[in-house]
Design a protein with these regions (language model features):
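Bacterial N-terminal signal peptides that target proteins for export
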Residues: 2-12
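Short glycine/acidic-enriched loop and turn motifs that connect beta-strands
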Residues: 43-44, 133-134, 175-181
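Conserved blade-register residue in beta-propeller folds
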Residues: 51-53, 96, 136-138, 187-189
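Repeated scaffold domains used in trafficking and secretory/extracellular systems
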Residues: 71-81, 112-121, 154-164
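Aromatic (tryptophan-biased) beta-strands that constitute blades/sheets of beta-rich domains
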Residues: 38, 53-70, 104-109, 140, ...
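Sec-dependent signal peptide cleavage junction
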Residues: 19-33
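Short coil/turn segments that connect the beta-strands within blades of beta-propeller domains
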Residues: 83-84, 123-124, 167
């Protein structure tokens, strides 16, 4: 008799549980951002940037706002979309967000503070320098600074283009302290594995 009652109670409990499961509404999946828009703002001599991830219907899925930085003649903020990631440069750091939902993946600090010039290699490592910076940085896909090379000995300044071919990277500069001719191409060639300067002109 007791065994039969237990079986009936167990059956009732299973029935009630199944009803509860069915009645719980399923939460609709949040739409993923398919495009990214960024806008730089200036106010009271301060610069900031707002980055938004938009879905297919152009609705805002996520938003990221940088801190406010003292405005200079060079931009201190920049946004680059690379595959499924969004790279936000704000002064001397990079904040990397996941494109679809804006989740912050990693942050790299102590890089070029303004006029950011950058390039990705085939493995998505990031190479960075700045318009007034004598250093070049290699940042991994996880945000680790793999190497930092000082370029002062070349006396080149105002970098404007980065080219990568095989294991070599070439940065082109507008000017050189020892040669003020703007018609000559000034460059530095690096080994991308270790950051060693191979040659310069």
């Amino acid at each position: 008799m007791k065994k039969k009652i237990r079986q009936i109670l167990l059956t009732l409990l299973l029935f009630v549980f199944s009803i509860l499961i069915i009645s719980i509404p399923t939460q609709a999946a949040k739409p993923a951002a398919t495009t990214v828009k960024s806008k730089t703002s200036y106010s009271n001599s301060k610069e900031s940037m707002t980055v938004r991830g938009l879905d297919a219907k152009k609705k805002v899925v996520w938003k990221y706002v940088t801190k406010k930085y003292t405005a200079t003649e060079l931009p201190r903020t920049k946004c680059i979309v690379r595959k499924d990631k969004v790279y936000v440069f704000e002064s001397s750091k990079i904040v990397v967000l996941r494109k679809k939902d804006g989740k912050q993946l990693w942050t790299a600090k102590k890089i070029s503070p303004a006029g950011h010039l950058c390039k990705f290699d085939k493995n998505d490592n990031l190479y960075i320098t700045g318009y007034y910076d004598n250093n070049v940085y290699k940042v991994s896909t996880k945000g680790k600074i793999l190497w930092k090379t000082n370029t002062s000995k070349a006396n080149n300044y105002w970098p404007y283009k980065i080219n990568i071919s095989g294991n070599q990277m070439t940065i082109l500069y507008e000017m050189n302290d020892n040669d003020d001719s703007s018609e000559k191409t000034h460059k530095i060639v690096f080994n991308i594995k270790n950051g060693k300067i191979l040659k310069y002109s």
